[in-house]
Amino acid sequence: LVAISASGNSPNIIKAIKWAKDKGINTVGLSAFDGGLLAKESDLNIHVPTKIGEYGPAEDLHMVICGLVGSFFRAHFKNDSN
């Protein structure tokens, strides 16, 4: 499960992380600010260190990370129907 939260404390995101961990699912968090609970609860956390409330840079970097991950999957898991 990949979860994204700038504050790292979004209740729905933390609930999803805890649910996934209870089911034995590996979790990856993308957090910003101070990382919040997401940084502590995720199996792997990618933290974008920004000042609290600095959503713009946090969301921009999260978008770049998601784009890179998408490019990786497209390059490594090509489907003949594409």
Model-found features: residue ranges?
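Glycine-rich phosphate-binding loops that contact phosphosugars or nucleotide phosphates
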Residues: 1-81
